[in-house]
Amino acid sequence: MDPNMNNLLKWGIQNSTATQQTSDSNNNASQAPRSNITPEMLSALFGGPSEADLMKAAMEALRSDEVDLENKLIAFDNFEQLIESIDNANNLEPLGLWTPLVELLKHEEPDMRRMAAWCIGTAVQNNEKAQDKLIVMNAIPTLVSMSTQDPVPAVRKKAVYALSSAVRNYQPGTNELVKHLPGGYASGKVDAADMDTIDMIMDKLRAHPVSSSPPSAA
């Protein structure tokens, strides 16, 4: 991926959130990135990249063999911040970004799996449209497998976060979760609005014993 585009992604996120800071913080945050803008970045900015463009550029970086892990994680962080907006989260489908995002749950690099789960959790939180899409993508079984089998604690933690966001107050998601839980967990009908029961399931997933061997490919 073009390094200028990667810098542009960082600049775009920093400036898109600057208005939410206090006046002093805003001045400090805006001055630093602007001082680092290159002519190439300005040229790209004159084209007016939208947040949809930035989302697509981030995913391009995540899928590129030419981008190292450090810059992929920067792109992932930018992507996650962008989809905190429900409008951007709902744009994942028309932009064709759900499929590659879900595929990254099975990446060989733990940090990539962790960030993919984090982004999914952000996208589906209090968002029925995205929660429904996650079921269509058949991602809940993968997230259950990650939360109970992945050898890396940080990955498991984000997988549980994604599941928690996917099922709360969304009955189809809760039904799908219960269907794929290991033995010893809640079975039968679980009310998606029963936060105590949902919390118990999530707490049990967080405490699930995991072997040292890597998860089997789904």
Curated annotation (Swiss-Prot):
InterPro entries: ARM-like (IPR011989), ARM-type_fold (IPR016024), Hsp70_NEF-Inhibitors (IPR050693), Nucleotide_exch_fac_Fes1 (IPR013918). ARM repeats lie at residues 26-67, 86-125, 128-168. The keyword ATP-binding does not apply. Functions as a nucleotide exchange factor (NEF) for Hsp70 chaperones which accelerates the release of ADP. Required for fully efficient Hsp70-mediated folding of proteins. It is found in: Cytoplasm. GO terms for biological process: cytoplasm protein quality control by the ubiquitin-proteasome system; regulation of translation. One of its GO terms (cellular component) is endoplasmic reticulum. It comes from the Eukaryota. GO terms for molecular function: adenyl-nucleotide exchange factor activity. Keywords: Cytoplasm, Repeat, Translation regulation. The keyword Transport does not apply. Pfam families: Fes1, HEAT_EZ. This is Hsp70 nucleotide exchange factor fes1. Belongs to the FES1 family.
